[in-house]
Amino acid sequence: TEKYESVKESMDSYLETWKRWNMEFIEAFHLIESSLYESSEERRISLLEKSLSVILDETYEKMLHYAQNLKSPITMLHMLGIIMPILGLVILPLVVSFMCQVKWFHLAALYNIALPIIVYYLGKNILSSRPTGYGDTDISEENPELKKYRNMIIPVGNFEIKINPMIISAMVMIVLLIIGFSPMLIHMMDTTGNWDIVVDKDDSKGIHISSVMDDPDAKYSLLGYRKSQGCPPGEDGAVGVGDIVGPFGLGAALLSLMIIAGIGVGLGIYFRLKSSNIIKIRDKAKELEKEFAASLFQLGNRLGDGLPAEIAFAKVAEVMENNVTGDFFRTVSNNITRMGMSVEQAIFDKKYGAMVYYPSTLIESSMKVLIESSKKGPLIAAKAVISVSRYIKEIHRVDERLKDLMSDTISSMKSQIKFLTPAIAGIVIGITSMITGILGQLGTQLRVLTEGQGQEGLGAAAPMISMFGEGIPTFYFQLIVGLYVVQLIYILTVITNGIENGSDSLGEKYSLGANLINSTVTYIIVSMIIMLIFNIISGSIMSQLKLGGV
């Protein structure tokens, strides 16, 4: 572009942009520049090795401090995002029951808007302080040939049917959402407004269809709609008297779990199908990266013996037989011998090159070094390849040390995502369902008692009636908590992946797919079991409790 007078001036200007983010990169680059002006070969190699150790050691030191400083923010995130909100969920149903001005949408604004924003902000602050380093990339973004693997591929003979993951995800989501919202749909289609399926307190009647709204003889109900007593409850002129509210039924609460399944599992399926094929290809390349240092060392030795690169690849392929590295070198060798390609074409050809099957920036960079250095002769290429081999080993060593530093934090966050958060939230939903059911049945029995005896006949018990508002239906409460669990799983997965792998969009999508499906299913199973157990216990107690003979 002729903006700068020399390459050095252009490079210095470029390095200025890194000053704020990565000083060790600038220092290492200056050492490489200095090596170009050294007359002594020994001194030149020493400077190059120094540049490598500077960037690796400084990165490790930064990550060490990051890991040490991570404990406090993660604890704060855990308390503000998980412990305190879930403890609050135990109290909030009681607040709603005794403060009729508080509605379910107030809780939704707190749990599904305010808290996720706070947790996301805290998480982004944690990630923003992470030192830059080696990170994985989405290989489908760099290689257009791999974009087809973002779809679900079904082989049919010689053809492949590609299905967009969004279609499958949308189908699953729509079916589960219809099932989840069925209590509201049934109520909307019911012209009388009184239809319900109930389990009677009298065991001899069992399950039957009821035409009485808020049937006092029902132990459990499917819908459980009732007429509002207004706010404040039981007082003349109260707001909302006679409005139909609900659904309060156990059946509706259980069916509402399908809404969360639709959102959580639907999103999980989308992320899983979009990334699973590509992650398999990348994992294969990662396996090659693990063995690549040893194979490069062997390749360097063959080149050092004076063998041309074409023959050296075949020799290494024979030695590294029956593993991924051997397959890579064999692919290169076959392209050279059978297709008459040059070494560069055999590796980088867009259609048949070895890099098509093993997409990796690390391997690609190593092979480019080999190609450029081999132009200056086998001995120069041998030294270059052996140096790259040592560099890869050093990167692997530092990477393993970093994983060891972060292991406690990462394992703690993964356990929260996979089990603790959905399980605790599921238990809270079960307890809430029981509390709401007991308060609702007590309110119903007191109202029936009032209608039979009047306010005067109740005496001192009369003020108790106004204590019991409608409360919040478990149907809505479960939606709020379930959606919060899905949001929390999403945010924590993004944070965990960012801490562990840095900027890795492909790994993030794959982790989101696995965690959203597994954690949502865990939440649904725990919620369903606890809800049934606690409601069976409370139903048995309330069926034996008769206020004033009611």
What do these predicted ranges mean?
Residues K19-H30, S34-D305, E318-D327, A354-P359, ...:
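Hydrophobic alpha-helical signal-anchor/transmembrane segments
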